Regions:
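Short, Lys/Arg-rich flexible segments
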Residues: 1-207
Length: 207
């Protein structure tokens, strides 16, 4: 969860001489906080895309829910929901689903743009495709990266080993990573919030 608020006690002390009623000040803060939070909902997916090889930025934004500030409580919350993302949602080579023509060297993937692609193989130098990752397409038409599970048989076909999808970082973890996405978004939201509060006070004083 990401939240936005203003230190009302410190602000009240700073503007004591302006004689702004507390109810009006809280109204100014509510507007400023909500405008900042709405902008942050746009910045977060953008910064995530800059840092990660995420293929579906729209899904990241869709998973963000905002609880707006109120006059009685000028605090806004942005909540990110979602489970681990399919590794296929990030940078994968090759992305092609072709069971009869898989890449001889296997598939590679990377999640962070700063990192180089890594070969997806459970056992180094595994013969053929047995323990290499491969692109799979389910009856629902969902496409993912998967690998065989050594020693576990597939239900309904004991001659084959079972498969499991490969996952990566969840969207909440991606957005809340303090050295990554939030490290870039926080300074911008702090500056915007201060600016919006100042604009609100200026508008009031001009009445």
């Amino acid at each position: 969860m990401i939240y936005f608020e203003v230190d009302t006690e410190e602000l009240s002390h700073a503007i004591r001489g302006l004689n702004i009623p507390k109810s009006k000040l809280n109204s100014i803060l509510k507007t400023a906080v909500n405008r900042t939070a709405r902008q942050a909902k746009t910045w977060l997916p953008e910064e995530a895309e800059d840092r990660y090889h995420i293929k579906r930025r729209g899904q990241v934004k869709k998973g963000l829910k905002m609880t707006g500030a109120k006059i009685s409580s000028p605090v806004a919350h942005i909540i990110s929901s979602g489970h681990a993302n399919d590794l296929y949602d990030f940078n994968v080579t090759s992305r092609r689903y072709s069971p009869g023509n898989r890449p001889p060297s296997g598939h590679k993937a990377n999640v962070l743009r700063a990192n180089s692609p890594v070969a997806l193989m459970l056992k180094p130098n595994a013969g053929r495709d047995k323990y290499r990752a491969f692109v799979v397409k389910y009856k629902s038409n969902h496409i993912a990266l998967a690998q065989r599970i050594p020693g576990k048989k597939m239900e309904g076909n004991s001659k084959k080993e079972a498969i499991r999808n490969l996952y990566s970082i969840s969207t909440p973890a991606m957005l809340g990573y303090e050295k990554g996405v939030m490290a870039k978004v926080s300074p911008k939201t702090e500056a915007l919030l201060a600016s919006e509060v100042a604009k609100g006070i200026e508008r009031y004083l001009k009445l």
